[in-house]
Amino acid sequence: LYKQGAILQPYLQHSDDLLVGVRTYPKINYSDVEKPIRSSNNEMFSYKDKYLENGGLEGSRRELPAKIDVLLKNQIIEILNNLLSILEIKGICRVDFLSKGNEVYLNEVNTIPGSYALYLWEHVGFSKFDLLNDMVNETKLKTNNWTNEGSDGTALKTAKDIQSKLG
């Protein structure tokens, strides 16, 4: 699988899912931490729980704000601050974590529309309209230094496998 590009991570038994909304305009803000409530006794927050039950994440049962220790919340904020300094995320995204005891692990960053979890912001006073308006305004004001150099896939096409590209 590694040669084909799959990333595998170990299963973290008896962990909880924690979700946080991130916005970068007009300044960096984080929503409250959400803890989704699983619809069954499953160990995992399943695809069915996340996207099919009750109309998806927005209609799912949750603790919002999550009843978590302040130290755990501070760890999440520290990870988010580091993440934003590294990835140059713009606009709105949802960041998913797993927690077990006093440890928190970054699981994924959801930057695609449909994964924004805009409902996370209503709890702290931002409507979906406010968020969309801020995203549009951010694109008008910010210039980026993105380039399409290397986007033709030449480097990957000439590599014998992904591992050789990663070093």
Regions from the language model: what does each represent?
Residues 1-59, 67, 99, 104:
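Phosphate-binding site of ATP-dependent enzymes
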